[in-house]
């Protein structure tokens, strides 16, 4: 019951207040009040000297900064810069622009800003900037009764961002926006972030194709020059590069091409056309990938992380091609030469043996000792005797069927005994040699070279990848 009566009394009291507000708003739009506003603005601008800062000769002017980041359009590694679009607002107090009698803020035409004093703010690391002008110049000037001035601009700036690309593309970059007074020192003007941590907004809404904004910081400081100390505000963005694009465009193709080069180890070694074509194709493809990557990056003096990976892949591909060159040399070059030389030596030895084993006989069947050599070993020396008869008719017989018996000397008997006792030692040597052949591949066997390459290349490439990713990925 009492609650209903209280509500009715509040309604009766608030009704006159609402009527008063409506009347005041209506009176503001009346021609007499519009003329008063016009007279107030004319009075403020009349005699206003834009050449002098507020409170000239007194304390420095405090200028507050606010930034609403609209977008980060591009981050370029080639030019070492980034493009930022923002709503940049500055506020300060100018007692010459204070007014009374109008309980409203005056938002004026953007051309009025040319008739008022504004801070000489500039971006220190700016390369190219402009104020948007569609459909009109995007700037705002707003006056408050106490003389506070709010000056806003919509700006797109391309600012320098010096990047360290040693860990590219697994890197993080810090790009800053430096705001400074060009002419006024700290004796005349002071900069501060208006709103503290909330002075910069819109950063969390930004999405970049190749980067993620991990964090941002606001810094206020003073810098010393020969002409004095100047105020500076710094907005720093910490950008982390997204690796997904580079995995699909660079790392995965390079890895697959490297693996493709190993297919030649399973192709027959006498298929020269297939193996050479595969090796050259993979080498040229790796060269193309490296060239395309260099075109998208600046010419810097140090080695980047992606350069190390591409260089490693190129080395593996090139070694696969050299492996076939080695196999080809063993099979078609050095191997046949050795076989030909051994065959020639063997045929020469057989020919000498045949000539030594041939005897000559005359027509009566008498053996002529013109070419038969009788070797007698006595007291560690050889006695060679030969008799010849040039008049006899000669027939050649193989002396392999002729057997000569002679008693064994003590030296020969001792040598045969040593041979019989030496057989086990030779067997042990052969077994050790066979064990060594299992451990050490025969580099003269082309099949063995390909077989070992099938294991060596994948293992070493996998080890290279493990070391690379463990080092560069945190």
UniProtKB/Swiss-Prot annotation:
Disulfide bonds: 161-175
Sites where a glycan is attached: 105, 174
Key words of the record: Cell membrane, Chloride, Chloride channel, Disease variant, Disulfide bond, Epilepsy, Glycoprotein, Ion channel, Ion transport, Ligand-gated ion channel, Membrane, Postsynaptic cell membrane, Receptor, Signal, Synapse, Transmembrane, Transmembrane helix, Transport
Primary localization: membrane
Signal peptide interval: 1-25
Positions contributing to 4-aminobutanoate binding: 182, 227
Any one GO molecular function term: GABA-A receptor activity
UniProt KW ATP-binding keyword: no
Any GO BP: response to progesterone
Domain notes: GABAARs subunits share a common topological structure: a peptide sequence made up of a long extracellular N-terminal, four transmembrane domains, intracellular or cytoplasmic domain located between the third and the fourth transmembrane domains.
NCBIfam families: LIC (TIGR00860)
Name this polypeptide is given: Gamma-aminobutyric acid receptor subunit beta-1
Native organism: Homo sapiens
